[in-house]
Structure formats: structure tokens, C-alpha cells
Amino acid sequence: MDVVKRRAVKNLVAKLTSVSEQTRTEALCELRLLSKNDAESRPLIAEADAVPLIAESLYSPAVILQENATATLLNLSISSKEHLMSSHGVLDALSHALRHPASPFVAQCAAATIFSLLSLESFRPIIGHKRDIIFGLVEIVRNQGSAARSIKDALRALFGVALYPLNRAQMVELGAVQALFSLVVKDGRVGLIEDATAVIAQVAGCEESWEVFKKALGIEVLMDLLDNATGSSYRVKENAVSSLLNSIQVGGEEVASDVRGRMEARVVDGILDVAENGSEKGKSKALALLKVLEAQDSRFEALTSHSS
């Protein structure tokens, strides 16, 4: 059976070099279905040197070629990440698909493929070094016309990029902070605020972020999210707590003093709510933030005495 599959895959891959666009399209359609429905075929497709040929199709103006190519690469990334990363031109092709997608589906699949590759820690600095990829992901988030699914996959990819600390400054430079806070303020679609604030919390862990946070009115946004009156989910509140705590840990007393000067009772109440009712990780971070901010509240004192 394996021999038969290999032969079938080899024949399909050979068709990707055809001068006929119809032949290439038909082969890509079959490879997409095969890689989606048959997990065993994925390594066979990758080993047949199909990846560079599939990636070339991302430069085609034809919607059907771009869609089938990005979907196939996404399927292959499930189990053949090393093949994708070692294949010439794949990251550049994905970058092109992010910035010049023939359809929203292409942008979504390209972002999802990047996110899949970022699950391997060793790939994060490599992908983070590709400025065009980060720029493309940020533009998807920035563009109010982007489909919700595309934005979600772009946010997940940006989160993966930000997990490598040395990538964060470049994200700030390429406008990620402004795009993320703008999304939080203007877009109420379920799940997007949670994902956006998760990225903000990661980006907050670099020295370059604080001044940009202030220029983007991000501090006010984070404090509004902590206000119980806004009805933010606990995940959003915990991300806001992490953002402030990470900023203080990186920026030291100067940032801590800045945050203290902006602190209001409503915000302290929100942090206390996380300390009392959040996840274990959220509770720990909320208590750490309250301690750094030198909060004076009987509930905080009760929580700290209980935790000690």
C-alpha cells in the first residue's frame, strides 16, 4: 500500500511542474484533499519534494491555486514542519500570501501555517527574523476589513512570534502595539479581544513597548478592561494584569511609579477580582501586581495573609 501511495504522490507532484495551469490546479486540488484526509500521505508528499513547488503557487494570481496551495501547506505543517522550514522559499512565499492574498481564505491559511510552524521553539527566531511576515500579520490585524478567522489566526501567529523575547522589539517597531490596541477598542467579536490581549501581554515584556503603550493610550485601555463595569472576561482581565506586571518587571520603578499615578479604585477592584476569582496563574500575577503597586486595601491584605 505504501508503494502505491508513494507512486500516486510522485505522479501528482510531477504534474506541479506542468506548463498547463489546469494540470497544476488539478494536481494541487488532489494533494490538498490527500493531505487533509490521509495523515499517512503528508510525509510522503513532503519527501517527494513537493513543498517548493506548492510554495511557488502562492505567487500565482489565480485564486484557486493560492487557496489550494496554502491549504496544502497548512495540512503538511501538521506533521512535516521540518520539511517546510528547510524547503527553499517557503517562508517568503507565505509572507507574500499574507501581504497579497487572492482571498481571505488564503490569508487565513498562511497565518495558520505560520502559527503551526511556530509551535516548534527552534523556529521562532527564524520566523521572527522575517520582517515581512510580522508586517503581514500586523496588517491583517490592523485592517478592519479582515475576516474574523484571518484575524484570529494572525493573532495566534503573533503570539507565537512574541514567545521568543528577541522578536518583541521588532513587533513594536512594525506597529503591532497600535494595531492590537485598536482592535481591542474597536472590535467586539468574541475571542478576538482575548487573543489580542494575550499578545499585548507578551509584547509588554520588552523595554521598547512602554512608551508606545502610552502613545497608543494602551495603559488607559488596559485599566478600562480591568474595570468590572466593562464586563471583560477573566481571561481578558488576566491578560491585562500580565501586561501591566510584565511592563513593570521590565521597566522597573519608573514604570511602576507611572502606573501607580494612573491607578484608580475601579482598577484596583478589578485586579482584586482576578486575585480572588481568576485562574491560579492569574491569581498569582494579580497579587504580584498589587504588591508592586503598593495597593492599600483590606481585601488585598486578607489575600496576602492567606497566601502566606
Predicted regions and their residues:
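Eukaryote-specific detector of the first structured module of a protein
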Residues: 3, 7-83
